[in-house]
Curated annotation (Swiss-Prot):
The keyword DNA-binding applies. GO terms for molecular function: cAMP response element binding; chromatin binding; DNA-binding transcription activator activity, RNA polymerase II-specific; DNA-binding transcription factor activity, RNA polymerase II-specific; DNA-binding transcription repressor activity, RNA polymerase II-specific; sequence-specific double-stranded DNA binding; SMAD binding; transcription cis-regulatory region binding. CDD domains: bZIP_CREB3. Belongs to the bZIP family. ATF subfamily. This is Cyclic AMP-responsive element-binding protein 3-like protein 1. There is a cross-link at residue 183 (Glycyl lysine isopeptide (Lys-Gly) (interchain with G-Cter in SUMO2)). Keywords: Activator, Developmental protein, DNA-binding, Endoplasmic reticulum, Glycoprotein, Isopeptide bond, Membrane, Nucleus, Signal-anchor, Transcription, Transcription regulation, Transmembrane, Transmembrane helix, Ubl conjugation, Unfolded protein response. Residues 72-98, 201-258, 446-467, 484-520 are annotated as: Disordered. Residues 501-511 have a biased composition (Basic and acidic residues). The gene is Creb3l1. The record marks 425-426 as: Cleavage. Residues 289-352 form the bZIP domain.
Amino acid sequence: MDAVLEPFPADRLFPGSSFLDLGDLNESDFLNNAHFPEHLDHFVENMEDFSNDLFSSFFDDPVLDEKSPLLDMELDSPAPGIQAEHSYSLSGDSAPQSPLVPVKMEDTTQDMEHGAWALGNKLCSIMVKQEQSPELPVDPLAASSAMAAATMATPPLLGLSPISRLPIPHQAPGEMTQLPVIKAEPPEMSQFLKVTQEDLVQMPPTPPSSHGSDSDGSQSPRSLPPSSPVRPMARSSTAISTSPLLTAPHKLQGTSGPLLLTEEEKRTLIAEGYPIPTKLPLTKAEEKALKRVRRKIKNKISAQESRRKKKEYVECLEKKVETYTSENNELWKKVETLETANRTLLQQLQKLQTLVTSKISRPYKMAATQTGTCLMVAALCFVLVLGSLAPCLPAFSSGSKTVKEDPVAADSVYAASQMPSRSLLFYDDGAGSWEDGHRGALLPVEPPEGWELKPGGPAEPRPQDHLRHDHADSIHETTKYLRETWPEDTEDNGASPNFSHPKEWFHDRDLGPNTTIKLS
């Protein structure tokens, strides 16, 4: 930047005037030390208050420390545009040129426009914002379009003031409405609108700054962007306006009159050891102390709000706990009642069971006894019926009898008979029978006195006569072994389906001279 400005001395850039060194300026020299006529003193006071609010609005954030080192440190400039020492006054003829006017375009570059006049552009834009008031509403878009038209219509703007020839920066309507408004009396506002160019460019010598200055321009205040502090100011002003413990911001920006502080602010000022300001305008020390006190009050309000919310949350939780506890107790009571009722019902059920068993056990036992008796009688009747049918079943009755051999009778059977006979009956041992286990020897058949052989059934034994009993057994065995073998279609138990006897095929044999027995 120095290389760009070397071919252009201060006399060529600003003929007939000298400009101040930017290294000697601080944050309070741009907006607080401008000299205006007496009828514009209110504007100077308003600009001083506005500059202080604008510069310190960055430190209103409660996140920052109260004793921020940024408040006491010296701000550095990017690069000073002018290094030479100049006088502290400007005449109407030597107003600084606008970057819109070409000054030897063959020797200058775009860096000069953005470097040497960047601070002036931002400064003038801040001053233009401050002029807006409720008495004269200005549309930002219309004003910017009008200023742009005027700039295009009149290229040489050397005769205009820096405030009037710089366009208003474009901002959203919401941001423009949030700017603090300075109340001004109508007569003074009309006088401000009629000022001349000579009155605007008259500037007194700047007193030495509190931060000091250096010849090489290493320390100078940085240019503050106009749009960035607007939003924090809007947020803080909204918080202040909603709090009853803080004074409204428009009351602190008055030019004259008494200053009415809240009781909380006064108490905090006394506790911090600061004097209580009573009149406007405020000094820098008073303003700094008041800002610190207001910041503490804001922190206190936010802490109270957080504690209030926490208390409400805890109270809500306590109410829920009480409600749930009462419901739990009621449920426990219901459970105990149900358990008691269950025990009572169980006892009644046991009593009923004992009563029922005591009353029903005797008839049940009697019925069971009667049933058993009936079954036994039925079984006995069945046995009797079977017993009555036993004579009709020779096969069943003959199988259970035991054959007794009589050795004397067996010898007499196979002995040669002295009596003449047609044939000799014999039993072939080679021919199998269906009852091999009951084979017996042939016994002599001698019918007893008064006994006749029945062809349809077995002979009925007579135990009173031993001889007759033996003869009956021998006759029965003879008839069993000498008859025809059973057919092939007999059942497994050896019984024939029909009890018809085969035809007679045996020969007659004379047993004696007097008796002849016909065997079947």
